[in-house]
Amino acid sequence: MFSDKMILIAGPCVIEGEEITLEIASKIHELVSPYADRIHWIFKSSYDKANRSSINSYRGPGLSEGLRILSKVKETLGVEILTDVHSPEEARAAAEVCDILQIPAFLCRQTDLLVAAAETNAIINIKKGQFLSPWDMQGPVDKVLSTGNNKIILTERGCSFGYNNLVSDMRSIPVLSSMGFPVVFDGTHSVQLPGGLKTQSGGQTEFIPTLTRAALAAGAHGLFIETHSHPAIAKSDAASMLPLKTFEALLPLWDQLYTCVRSFEMASV
């Protein structure tokens, strides 16, 4: 599906408007272009953040306008598009534009959503719920496979660890890999402090370099990174998104580490 390239799902958390979305996407495109032979970049952004902590928080432009903007990014940059869907109806609409449909972590056991998304024949990225063990992901995988669609990505995004905290267990990477599909590590949601700021989630971005290095060393096939030109004023997940300048600085490290781990794996076969 992605050959041996490192998968890099990257973009802003939520669509904040056409201009800034295209600006961020264009900058990521510029940064990853030198690695095009080794990194498979997929642009991500959400048209609706349906699980915001507060009723007053910005959710996004909505399905219709969001898909229009994602389509513009796709046409302008020639990049594959990923977005998350929340209902069977949204899955069918989003598949008209997006190459990859993402099942949110909180919804990863919703049978009707998984089946409807899979039936579009898009690639399905299932994010592991914070409440699930890695081996429990076989259930969601089987629901997608029941439709005949075997184009699956599994994303690890941390496990609930007491109140307002997540922990990343790197044993999850080989467990999920044993199911036969690419495993991506979500380096930004994994550093969230859910509800840690009362009406919004906090975050510890200083741990993103450590956790992403650990995940690639553990054998992850790629990374999921939410990034923004100015995270401090972003309308969603401001506390956990990676600044584009830091994203740029980490790219060569991720590339070298992924290549190194893959070379050792090939040598041991």
Swiss-Prot record:
UniProt pathway annotation: Carbohydrate biosynthesis; 3-deoxy-D-manno-octulosonate biosynthesis; 3-deoxy-D-manno-octulosonate from D-ribulose 5-phosphate: step 2/3; Bacterial outer membrane biogenesis; lipopolysaccharide biosynthesis
Keyword Transcription in record: no
Record's subcellular location: Cytoplasm
Molecular function in Gene Ontology: 3-deoxy-8-phosphooctulonate synthase activity
Top-level taxonomic group: Bacteria
Enzyme class: transferase
GO BP, sorted A to Z: keto-3-deoxy-D-manno-octulosonic acid biosynthetic process
Gene3D superfamilies assigned to the protein according to its UniProt record, in alphabetical order: Aldolase class I
One Pfam family here: DAHP_synth_1
Keywords of this entry: Cytoplasm, Lipopolysaccharide biosynthesis, Transferase
EC number(s) reported in the record: 2.5.1.55
InterPro entries with a match to the protein in the record: Aldolase_TIM, DAHP1/KDSA, KDO8P_synthase
The keyword Ion transport is annotated on this UniProt entry: no
One GO cellular component, as annotated: cytoplasm
Similarity section: Belongs to the KdsA family.
Entry protein name: 2-dehydro-3-deoxyphosphooctonate aldolase
Naturally occurring in which organism (per UniProt): Chlamydia felis (strain Fe/C-56)
